[in-house]
Structure formats: structure tokens, C-alpha cells
């Protein structure tokens, strides 16, 4: 049964008159998949309701933050109490100290952390700090890894290691990105060549340990190990961008997953967001004390923000971290996520469709490919036309996945076995149609 979208269409047309493209973040516009975006009216648990009061099982969760599901009672209570005390002060609070202490307790690679308001702000500030701490200018990033929309990071791979990267957005002058070196993800040979050529100039290597903006592609253990070795050898800082993976794939973030495979492994700097705010605008970056003390007011690297450490956002984040720290939380979350990906794969395979899937904790991805891709070029081989059919088929059946082939999905603690079974059943029906 196709759900009625009339009220969503009315709102979308209204929005387009006053907001560019009708949305405040491009992926929400359904441009990749076509059709009308769903305008959310309310959300609770594993579900949201659109402008037509149609219910959807939500596998986006605000693109990751809603690990407990929408409207968790403990989080709502904490936020309501904080609101009654005041929205914003522009002055320090005890709660921001408590949140920083909790983050550092759970992620021991950092001695200090600075709170900001968005992942882009955190990544941008991390690069500035890395450059200030090392006295170097160049940074390495990988094609397909997304670190927010700061100018220096909006770069795609150039035509070889010796060339500058090319801006991927209008409005970014080439000279702004001339210090950004873009490499292929999971390519150790290319990584070694880049350090051999420019190692003494590299301030930092920034990477997503699991890339959530080319769907779900994880860094191989040998690749992460070599990144660590080369950064140490050449005096560059290894930055783990855990805006998406932090507290989403494991209590200690993705770095704790790699530490199980690489003895003594730690990144030098960590970027965090999403889950640490529990759905509020909150992000952070941190490192060892020797690096963080380069930040103003102690050092000469300037960073500031009017709403940094906002008292309502920190209340939301602190309540969320306390809930996910409870024993057995991640084991249960991972089981639910695996049951989803296993069910989807079995349903697709039964219809003769190419399908591969992967997950870690409460984060997952799938591809209409026989094998899991290892880099952006391989991801691009996925069947986008068939994905669009799958997306709309699920949407019509009340299941909301990312409206783009290159985005990861998220499971929350609120998703039940019944939710997963219903989702797999819906997917099975769609697979039968699109396999013909």
C-alpha cells in the first residue's frame, strides 16, 4: 500500500519558497532517490510520524545520535530539568565539566576535551590545533571520508599524489585546499608513498575508522596499523574522526575496536559528536594534554563558541552516556543490528540479488554488490537505480532508511525483535519486485 504524502508535498513546496532546496541539509531533500521528503511531526522510541500522521520505523535516528531511540524517559527528564534552570549562559557550568569527565573516562586516549556545537566545528578546530601543535601545514584525508563542510576538507582526490586536491564545492578557492592531500582509503602503498614524499610537512592524518558517508566501509586492521606507524615515524598526528562512530559502535568508540586487534593502539586526537549530544547540537575534540594545551586561553591556537558547552545540550548528552554505559547495552544493540543485516541479506539472496552487509554495534550498511567494498571507487559500483527502488518500496511500507546510497544506517535500543522482523518482511516483498 502506498502511503499518502499530500501534506508532506504541501510543506515541501512551502519550504522551498523560504529555504534553499526546501531543506536545511541537502540529503533531506530526497534528491538522490526522487520523491517527496517526509516532514517529521513527532517521534517516539523507534518510530516517527510524518505530516500525514503515517508511522515509520526509523533507521536513521537523526543520522546517528538517537542511540536510545526517540524520547527516552531518562533523557527527557534531564533535558526538562535543565531547561527550567536556563537555556544558555555564555559562562562555565558544572555540567560541562561532568560531561568532559565522563567522555575522558570512556575514551582514555584523551587527557582533555573541548566541547563545541557541531561535528564540522570540531573537525575544523582539530585541524587548526594539529597545525598549531606541529608547526606544519599539510593534512591527509581519504576519498569518501566526510569530516564536515570546512573548506580544507571539501576535497576530492587529485590526479596523483604530487598534485593538489580539487575543491568539491563551488566557493572553495584552490589555494585553500593546496595543503590537503587526498588518498584512497585502505590503500597502504599509496599511504606509504605520500609520507615518503611529504612526511615532514604533514601535520595530521584525519580518517574515519568506519566511513559512514560512503555507506559503511571499515578501515582494515593492517591499514589502521600502518597509519599509526607512519604518523609516529614522521611526527604527524593521527586523528580519528569518531563523530559518527563514537559511542555508536562501542562504548569506547571505534578506536576501542581497533585496540583489540592492534596492541597499545591509540589515535593522537579524536573528534566526536552525534551520540555525545543525545540529539542536541553538541560535539567535541580531544587529545593528550601536551596537544590540547596549545588551545587558547592556555596557548596560541584560537577556538571559541558562544553556545559551546550549552547547559541543555550537556544535560542531554550526559544522560545519554549514563544510559549507554549500563552493562550489556552494546551487546544487546549489536545483536539487534546483526539480526537486521542478516535478515536483509538472506531475503535478498533468496531472490538472487547481489547483496552484502556489515555492521558494528548500532551502525550498519548494505550494498547491492556481491562483496563488501573497501574504498570509494568500489562503493560507486553499487546499483543506484535498484537502491532507489528499494528505498521507495520500503518507504511505502513504513520503513525509513537513508534516502541516499552512500549513507550508513542506525539501529537504536528502542528497536524490538518485532520491528526487525517486520522490516525484513517488508524488504523481502520489495526484493521480490525489484529482482524481476
From Swiss-Prot:
- What cofactor(s) does the depicted protein rely on? pyridoxal 5'-phosphate
Hey, which pathway is this one from? Porphyrin-containing compound metabolism; protoporphyrin-IX biosynthesis; 5-aminolevulinate from L-glutamyl-tRNA(Glu): step 2/2
The yes or no answer to whether the keyword Isomerase is present is yes
Per its record, the protein catalyses: (S)-4-amino-5-oxopentanoate = 5-aminolevulinate
Q: Which Pfam families match?
A: Aminotran_3
Q: Where in the cell is it found?
A: Cytoplasm
The GO biological-process annotations, alphabetized, read as: protoporphyrinogen IX biosynthetic process
> Where are the N6-(pyridoxal phosphate)lysine residues found in this chain?
274
Q: Name one GO cellular component term.
A: cytoplasm
Q: Name one GO molecular function term.
A: transaminase activity
- Statement: the UniProt record of this protein carries the keyword Cytoplasm: yes
Protein keywords: Cytoplasm, Isomerase, Porphyrin biosynthesis, Pyridoxal phosphate
Stated EC number for the protein is 5.4.3.8
Subunit structure and binding partners: Homodimer.
Protein name from the UniProt record:
Glutamate-1-semialdehyde 2,1-aminomutase
Amino acid at each position: 500500500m502506498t502511503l499518502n504524502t499530500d501534506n508532506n508535498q504541501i510543506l515541501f513546496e512551502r519550504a522551498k519558497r523560504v529555504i534553499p532546496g526546501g531543506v536545511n541539509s541537502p540529503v533531506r531533500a530526497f534528491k538522490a532517490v526522487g520523491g517527496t521528503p517526509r516532514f517529521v511531526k513527532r517521534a517516539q522510541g523507534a518510530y516517527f510520524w510524518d505530516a500525514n500522521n503515517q508511522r515509520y520505523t526509523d533507521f536513521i535516528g537523526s543520522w546517528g545520535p538517537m542511540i536510545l531511540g526517540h524520547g527516552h524517559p531518562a533523557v527527557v527528564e534531564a533535558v526538562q530539568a535543565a531547561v527550567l534552570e536556563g537555556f544558555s549562559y555564555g559562562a562555565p557550568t558544572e555540567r560541562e565539566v561532568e560531561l568532559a569527565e565522563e567522555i575522558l573516562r570512556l575514551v582514555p586516549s584523551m587527557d582533555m576535551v573541548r566541547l563545541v556545537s557541531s561535528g564540522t566545528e570540531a573537525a575544523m578546530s582539530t585541524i587548526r590545533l594539529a597545525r598549531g601543535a606541529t608547526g606544519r601545514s599539510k593534512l591527509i584525508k581519504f576519498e569518501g571520508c566526510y569530516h564536515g563542510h570546512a573548506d580544507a576538507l571539501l576535497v576530492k582526490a587529485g590526479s596523483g599524489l604530487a598534485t593538489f586536491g580539487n575543491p568539491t564545492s563551488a566557493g572553495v578557492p584552490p589555494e585553500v585546499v593546496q595543503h590537503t592531500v587526498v588518498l584512497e582509503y585502505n590503500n597502504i602503498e599509496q599511504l606509504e608513498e605520500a609520507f615518503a614524499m611529504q612526511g615532514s610537512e604533514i601535520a595530521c592524518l584525519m580518517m574515519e575508522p568506519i566511513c559512514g558517508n560512503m555507506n559503511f566501509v571499515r578501515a582494515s586492521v593492517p591499514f589502521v596499523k600502518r597509519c599509526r606507524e607512519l604518523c609516529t615515524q614522521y611526527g604527524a598526528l593521527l586523528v580519528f574522526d569518531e563523530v559518527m562512530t563514537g559511542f555508536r559502535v562501542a562504548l569506547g568508540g571505534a578506536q576501542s575496536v581497533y585496540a583489540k586487534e592492534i596492541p597499545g593502539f591509540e589515535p593522537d586526537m579524536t573528534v566526536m559528536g552525534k551520540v555525545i549530544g543525545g540529539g542536541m547540537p553538541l560535539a567535541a575534540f580531544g587529545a593528550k594534554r601536551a596537544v590540547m594545551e596549545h588551545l587558547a586561553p592556555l596557548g596560541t591556537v584560537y577556538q571559541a563558541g558562544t553556545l559551546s558547552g550549552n547547559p541543555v545540550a550537556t544535560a542531554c548528552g550526559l544522560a545519554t552516556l549514563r544510559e549507554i554505559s549500563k552493562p550489556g547495552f552494546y551487546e544487546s544493540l549489536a545483536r539487534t543490528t546483526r539480526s537486521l543485516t542478516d535478515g536483509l541479506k538472506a531475503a535478498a539472496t533468496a531472490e538472487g540479488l547481489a547483496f552484502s552487509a556489515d555492521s558494528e554495534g548500532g551502525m550498519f550498511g548494505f550494498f547491492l554488490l556481491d562483496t563488501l567494498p573497501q574504498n570509494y571507487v568500489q562503493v560507486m559500483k553499487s546499483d543506484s537505480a535498484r537502491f532507489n527502488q528499494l528505498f521507495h518500496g520500503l518507504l511505502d511500507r513504513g520503513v525509513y532508511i537513508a534516502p541516499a546510497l552512500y549513507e550508513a544506517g542506525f539501529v537504536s535500543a528502542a528497536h524490538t525483535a518485532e520491528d526487525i522482523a517486520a522490516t525484513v518482511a517488508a524488504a523481502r516483498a520489495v526484493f521480490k519486485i525489484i529482482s524481476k
